[in-house]
């Protein structure tokens, strides 16, 4: 009998065989700018609360007055905050769920799933709530002396990280 290719740890609802792939094979980077002022909602990424309005999280807006050069993120897309914290020693990856759209600093790495029929968005939400991805990010991360907890991770390296994903 053929051995099934599944990880020891399973997320509820994902029962299929799994395969190893590069993140960039299942997602694409989002670099869309807020050039047409499609949104004025400045967001931040909190390890605890996800993508959240800066004014709600910090009790003030910390974004620049001119946010046309910020990334525009849409509901269902993901963002990676490279800042380390007690709750997120390797940063935090969160999906935009609370709002229809918002803007983020270009320091963040944004991405969306290439084929929602192939990869369930809930899988990535669950995956990035675990520490399973930390091994991969450790391989590419370097913390600069002047970065004060901001990991030096190039977008190209981020999308080269390996992950186990359910097969089609």
Regions found by a protein language model. Give the residues of each.
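A short glycine-rich beta-alpha junction/loop motif
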Residues: 3-7, 101-107, 142-167
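Localized chelating/binding microdomains
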Residues: 19-22, 135-138, 163-167
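A short beta-sheet element
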Residues: 68-133, 142, 146
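Sequence-specific dsDNA recognition surfaces
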Residues: 24-35, 40, 44-79, 112-113
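Non-catalytic DNA-recognition/assembly elements of restriction-modification systems
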Residues: 8-34, 160
């Amino acid at each position: 009998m053929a051995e099934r290719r599944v990880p020891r740890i399973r997320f509820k609802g994902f029962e299929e065989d799994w395969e190893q792939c590069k993140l960039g094979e299942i997602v694409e980077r989002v670099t869309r700018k807020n050039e047409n002022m499609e949104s004025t909602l400045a967001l931040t990424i909190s390890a605890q609360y996800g993508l959240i309005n800066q004014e709600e999280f910090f009790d003030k807006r910390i974004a620049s007055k001119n946010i046309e050069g910020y990334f525009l993120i849409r509901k269902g897309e993901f963002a990676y905050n490279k800042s380390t914290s007690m709750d997120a020693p390797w940063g935090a990856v969160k999906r935009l769920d609370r709002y229809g759209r918002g803007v983020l600093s270009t320091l963040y790495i944004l991405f969306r799933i290439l084929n929602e029929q192939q990869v369930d968005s809930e899988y990535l939400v669950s995956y990035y709530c675990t520490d399973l991805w930390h091994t991969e990010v450790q391989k590419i991360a370097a913390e600069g002396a002047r970065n004060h907890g901001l990991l030096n991770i190039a977008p190209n390296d981020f999308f080269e990280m390996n992950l186990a994903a359910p097969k089609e």
